[in-house]
């Protein structure tokens, strides 16, 4: 069975990925910019996408730009940021109604692609730099976004684990950059960082919906004029592994302790044993039938929540849990016991089958939305590999108990981080 028919084409420095499907009533445009994660650039890269959405060369006023979105039947536009291992990804999303369902047959797809290209490639400028007013306003908003991580103790404890575990590795940088670096950014600095990204980033455009493939290719050639560039090969992230696991304890005025434990998996998205790692994580802490959920949360009642997730491009497995401060040692012990049980193969064939079924359902649910489908396909583009959904699911299905035990033996405990509460906020 073929789940997705993805057509790829090169247009200068951009790779277009067109998925023709009648599943959605809208057409989804997703534009991705990928570059190495660096301290010098991460904060500027977190800022300029939001400045770009404030105005274009032809519609420099934000109000005029938003009015135009409304003219295009309420077209929605957004920008966000993610990390894929030691690389920083900027995403622009634009969703437009499918013109086939409109009475007046406005050429919305072409207008949508033209608008996206203007937002990314033709910003509003003043004296060869971004507009100072927009930069000032978006700097304030970026500071608020960075501060929000510190105020949300679940996100903060995960950030602290990564900072301790990946000290002196680019992955330790937060996707939104550094609070103290925001203030010093000038409109000129920001514009230079933006120009570098346009020149050098890996650029991918996803067009998903009931579209005419040739029409899309022609529009991309017309509106997205970029120079060809040599893509840097995808490389395994550097890791400064320590000889012995470390423990880090912070104290803050919170009621609920946050226990986060980081492991190095030594397996990433392009490795042959990656499917086995996915099943390992599902059995260990990824789902509601996993060991962490059943034994730490349900049976021992030691955690308000307990789960694990894999960072596919960096090679990390991270456990996140919320516990009473007095239960710290007991919780660490029982989590370690669940990990040992996984390494020892203490799980049944039924457990494996259930986990595979949940992973498959999760993938199918993900690709059932245009947003999720673009993200799933982008995993391959960012790693510069071809793994069709059918093969990905087949690889999961083929995983054996021995494969799971073997991948588990490569996983090493690295850092235990505890945000110790002293009462106060949760």
Regions found by a protein language model. Name each.
Residues 94, 102-151:
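Hydrophobic alpha-helical hairpins/lids featuring a short glycine-rich hinge
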Residues 132-195:
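Compact, aliphatic and Gly/Pro-tolerant "microcore" segments centered on a short helix or tight beta-hairpin
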Residues 82-83, 191-198, 308-310, 405-409:
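Short, flexible, solvent-exposed loop/turn segments with mixed acidic/basic and small polar residues
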Residues 144-145, 245-256, 360-370:
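Short, low-order "capping/linker" segments at domain edges
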Residues 66, 122-146, 234-241, 341-366:
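Acidic/histidine-enriched alpha-helical segments
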Residues 1-73, 104, 178, 184, ...:
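His/Glu-rich zincin catalytic helix
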Residues 19, 25-35, 63-118, 155-177, ...:
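M16 family metallopeptidases and their MPP-like homologs
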């Amino acid at each position: 069975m073929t789940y997705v028919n993805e057509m790829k084409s090169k247009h200068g420095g951009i790779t277009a990925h067109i998925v023709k499907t009648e599943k959605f009533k809208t057409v989804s445009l997703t534009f991705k910019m990928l570059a190495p994660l660096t301290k010098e650039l991460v904060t500027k890269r977190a800022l300029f996408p939001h400045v770009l959405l404030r105005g274009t060369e032809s519609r420099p006023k934000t109000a005029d730009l938003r009015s135009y979105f409304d003219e295009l039947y309420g077209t929605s536009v957004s920008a966000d940021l993610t990390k894929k291992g030691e690389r920083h990804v900027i995403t622009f999303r634009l969703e437009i109604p499918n013109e086939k369902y409109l009475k007046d047959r406005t050429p919305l797809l072409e207008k949508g692609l033209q608008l996206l290209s203007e937002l990314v490639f033709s910003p509003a400028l003043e004296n060869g730099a971004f507009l100072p007013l927009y930069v000032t306003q978006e700097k304030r908003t970026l500071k608020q976004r960075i501060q929000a991580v510190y105020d949300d103790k679940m996100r903060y404890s995960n950030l602290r684990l990564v900072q301790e575990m990946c000290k002196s590795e680019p992955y330790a940088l937060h996707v939104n950059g550094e609070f103290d670096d925001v203030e010093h950014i000038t409109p000129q600095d920001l514009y230079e960082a933006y120009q570098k990204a346009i020149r050098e980033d890996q650029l991918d455009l996803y067009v998903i919906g009931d579209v005419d493939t040739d029409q899309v290719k022609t529009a991309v050639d017309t509106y997205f004029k970029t120079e060809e560039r040599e893509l840097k090969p995808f490389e395994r992230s550097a890791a400064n592994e320590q000889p012995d696991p470390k423990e880090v304890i912070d104290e803050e005025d919170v009621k609920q302790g946050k226990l986060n434990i980081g492991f190095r998996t030594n397996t990433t998205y392009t490795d042959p044993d990656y499917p086995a790692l996915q099943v390992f994580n599902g059995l260990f802490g990824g789902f509601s039938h996993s060991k962490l959920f059943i034994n730490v949360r349900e049976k021992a009642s030691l955690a308000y929540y307990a789960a694990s997730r894999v960072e596919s491009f960096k090679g990390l497995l991270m456990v996140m849990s919320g516990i009473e401060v007095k239960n710290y040692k007991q919780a660490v012990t029982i989590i370690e016991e669940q990990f040992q049980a996984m390494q020892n193969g203490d799980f049944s064939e039924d457990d494996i089958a259930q986990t595979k079924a949940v992973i498959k359902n999760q993938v199918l649910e993900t690709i059932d939305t245009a947003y999720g489908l673009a993200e799933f396909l982008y995993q391959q583009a960012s790693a510069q590999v071809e793994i069709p959904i059918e093969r990905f699911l087949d690889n999961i299905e083929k995983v054996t108990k021995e494969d799971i035990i073997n991948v588990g033996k490569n996983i090493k405990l690295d850092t235990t981080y505890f945000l110790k509460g002293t009462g106060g906020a949760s």
